[in-house]
Amino acid sequence: MKSINILSFLLLSSTLSLVAFARSFTSENPIVLPTTCHDDDNLVLPEVYDQDGNPLRIGERYIINNPLLGAGAVYLYNIGNLQCPNAVLQHMSIPQFLGEGTPVVFVRKSESDYGDVVRVMTVVYIKFFVKTTKLCVDQTVWKVNDEQLVVTGGKVGNENDIFKIMKTDLVTPGGSKYVYKLLHCPSHLGCKNIGGNFKNGYPRLVTVDDDKDFIPFVFIKA
């Protein structure tokens, strides 16, 4: 009988301890879990680096290049003789698609606590750095159209035209470990990787739903 009483006492003590523990974490005293959100003031996001290991900087010119064998740099092209070229393509080791990339600059809507350094998974707008007419001066910022194609015609500050850069684990054939992927991240939706697809005979940049499907990129100072 004594052993039963001792067991009952232990069970009751354990129950009361659990109740007290649970009550100590109310809405007024919540459990704070670790976070990886870039809004956490205590988290310093890694810098994005160019192919040579230098930090990517806002306003400076870069070539966005696919380092894989047979692939090439991103460039601006005119499909259909439009007044303003708006197709964002990728050079390839095919005669009609050989060539140099078009320089881009990364810009922000306003000044940032990050200074002029681009950091992973922070908001940037991508803009081709090209000579253009007054008619097309506002047609150089990247966006994604209704066909999920990356085109120009976006606007700095438009929440639908936001891009972000994420580090990958890939290493280039030349040994560079600074390989990234681009994501389209409209504020009202989740991010989607930028991949590639032949559309009407052209190697287009497109958004893709599969998280494992993306084009790897390195950034080369122009």
Swiss-Prot record:
The keyword Signal applies. This is Cysteine protease inhibitor 1. Pfam families: Kunitz_legume. Belongs to the protease inhibitor I3 (leguminous Kunitz-type inhibitor) family. One of its GO terms (molecular function) is cysteine-type endopeptidase inhibitor activity. Its main location: other. The keyword Transmembrane does not apply. Tubers, leaves. It comes from Solanum tuberosum (Potato). A motif (Vacuolar targeting signal) lies at residues 29-34. One of its GO terms (cellular component) is vacuole. It is found in: Vacuole. Potent inhibitor of cathepsin l (cysteine protease). Does not inhibit trypsin or chymotrypsin (serine proteases). May protect the plant by inhibiting proteases of invading organisms. Induction: By wounding. Also expressed in upper non-wounded systemic leaves. Residues 27-42 form a propeptide. PANTHER family: CYSTEINE PROTEASE INHIBITOR 1 (PTHR33107:SF44), KUNITZ TRYPSIN INHIBITOR 2 (PTHR33107). Keywords: Disulfide bond, Protease inhibitor, Signal, Thiol protease inhibitor, Vacuole. It comes from the Eukaryota. Disulfide bonds join 84-136, 185-191.
